[in-house]
Amino acid sequence: MARIAGIDLPKNKRIEIALTYIYGIGRTTAKNILVATSIDGSTRTDKLTEAEIGKLREEIDKNVKVEGDLRREVSMNIKRLMDLGCYRGLRHRKGLPCRGQRTKTNARTRKGPARTVAGKKK
């Protein structure tokens, strides 16, 4: 089983798809990595040689930010926005959508489960 960037890649999948199991690598990035390392994308993960796995590891370490580093960078970007006190930072701080979606209805994913408010007495 190939282990790249701390992730065990699935054996029975094509390497082009298996690389997408690594956080930070999508289909396009996976194709670019395979072109750079001159490995055929239709090769199954278990058919890769140690040399090819080494080339993949080296290419990913050198040119792509993945897993922990990428997660850390994203969280630092969000923290920076919150420290600045800009609109997006305030929305992150309040746990609301920050890309202009409506919040009167919907937005339940960001706001969490609905808190019921007592109705008005007649």
Swiss-Prot record:
The organism's taxonomic lineage, starting at the top: Bacteria, Pseudomonadati, Thermodesulfobacteriota, Desulfuromonadia, Geobacterales
Span list, region Disordered: 97-122
Source organism of the structure: Trichlorobacter lovleyi (strain ATCC BAA-1151 / DSM 17278 / SZ)
Physiological role: Located at the top of the head of the 30S subunit, it contacts several helices of the 16S rRNA. In the 70S ribosome it contacts the 23S rRNA (bridge B1a) and protein L5 of the 50S subunit (bridge B1b), connecting the 2 subunits; these bridges are implicated in subunit movement. Contacts the tRNAs in the A and P-sites.
HAMAP family: Ribosomal_uS13 (MF_01315)
Gene3D superfamilies, A to Z: 1.10.8.50, 30s ribosomal protein s13, domain 2 (4.10.910.10)
One Pfam short name: Ribosomal_S13
Subunit composition and interactions: Part of the 30S ribosomal subunit. Forms a loose heterodimer with protein S19. Forms two bridges to the 50S subunit in the 70S ribosome.
GO cellular component assignments: cytosol; small ribosomal subunit
Keyword set includes Ribonucleoprotein: yes
Record keywords, A-Z: Ribonucleoprotein, Ribosomal protein, RNA-binding, rRNA-binding, tRNA-binding
Metal-binding as UniProt keyword: no
InterPro entries reported in the protein's UniProt record: Rbsml_uS13_C, Ribosomal_uS13, Ribosomal_uS13-like_H2TH, Ribosomal_uS13_bac-type, Ribosomal_uS13_CS
Regions annotated as coiled coil: none
Molecular-function annotations in GO: rRNA binding; structural constituent of ribosome; tRNA binding
Family as reported in the entry's similarity comment: Belongs to the universal ribosomal protein uS13 family.
Gene from which the chain derives: rpsM
Protein name: Small ribosomal subunit protein uS13
Domain of life: Bacteria
